[in-house]
Amino acid sequence: MILSSLLPLSLVTLTSAALTYRGADISSLLIEEDSGVAYKNLNGETQAFELILANNGVNSIRQRIWVNPSDGSYNLEYNLELAKRVQDAGMSVYLDLHLSDTWADPGDQATPSGWSTTDIDTLAWQVYNYTLDVCNTFAENNVAVEIVSIGNEIRNGLLHPLGSTDHYDNIARLLHSGAWGVKDSSLSTTPKILFHLDNGWDWDAQKYFYDTVLATGTLLSTDFDLIGVSYYPFYNADATLSSLKTSLTNLKSNYGKNVLVVETDWPVQCSSPEYAFPSDLSSIPFSADGQETFLGRLADTLEDVGGVGIYYWEPGWVDNAGLGSSCEDNLMVDWRDRTVRESISVFGDL
């Protein structure tokens, strides 16, 4: 402690918080608050969750946007309200466009209601106009946007059936259209455009997608800036940090893009995991301390390959503690009393 206090401030800064984006996805926040959830900081004081995160080193927030959800959840209006709070808390905004009315993931990529499922020309224009409108709406409300993801976990395509992997030429066109909707918007600073696949540890899957979609000639390397991946260690024993490092290294070198992990979690309770955990993570406990250890090692992996960020997925979704996994609790908030766990402070060290 004494020695660190004698170091020049510039050196202290360089030895911590090396990642550009130390983030979290808190898309569910407004829904949680509407249900009566109030969060407590490490001192046990009630505080807005975005402020708790900002005060503990988070500098960027990821938000999922659905096109026309039946109950309004995660629509444009919802996300604009959340983004204003994020910006007021001093954090950047990362918009995750699902391009669907509901969850988009490797198993579900449903085209929004009212969008074409039969004509690719029409659908491409709808994607362009939608992304343009989203970005212009944020611009009109003086909310800056740092990153926009065109689609979510699109390894199996997007906007099915036209954008399925039976039609990589269509996938390329849809991604190109979405990218240019962002580029043509009135945002004063053009957001970085990101494409996002699941199973970030699986280099073969990543390579096949990008090689195939870029080979069409419709999607250009200049259309996007970042490659994002999901990295969930509890879904596959092959999801080792070593495999992730290889995949991220290759993604960056092959395609010339900065890489980041845009979804990840670690459990505090996982009594009966459906799948074995990866061998190089098996020593990490299921606990708040384990969350800190895992994220620290993940950050080290990102830094080793020149990666730029990590986003923890839904650390405060207390009504969904398992976050879709076979583990009982992956949160950084105690779902019983809504107090954040000590692991929340790890972001300042990433």
From Swiss-Prot:
It comes from the Eukaryota. Its EC number is 3.2.1.89. GO terms for cellular component: extracellular region. Glycans are attached at residue 129. The keyword RNA-binding does not apply. The active site is at 153 (proton donor), 263 (nucleophile). Residues 1-17 form the signal peptide. It holds the Pfam family Glyco_hydro_53. It catalyses: The enzyme specifically hydrolyzes (1->4)-beta-D-galactosidic linkages in type I arabinogalactans. InterPro entries: Glyco_hydro_53, Glycoside_hydrolase_SF. Keywords: Carbohydrate metabolism, Cell wall biogenesis/degradation, Glycoprotein, Glycosidase, Hydrolase, Polysaccharide degradation, Secreted, Signal. GO terms for molecular function: arabinogalactan endo-1,4-beta-galactosidase activity; glucosidase activity. Optimum pH is 5.0. SUPFAM superfamilies: (Trans)glycosidases (SSF51445). Its main location: secreted. PANTHER family: ARABINOGALACTAN ENDO-BETA-1,4-GALACTANASE A (PTHR34983:SF1). Endogalactanase involved in the degradation of plant cell wall polysaccharides, and more particularly of hairy regions of pectin. This is Arabinogalactan endo-beta-1,4-galactanase A. It comes from Emericella nidulans (strain FGSC A4 / ATCC 38163 / CBS 112.46 / NRRL 194 / M139). The gene is galA.
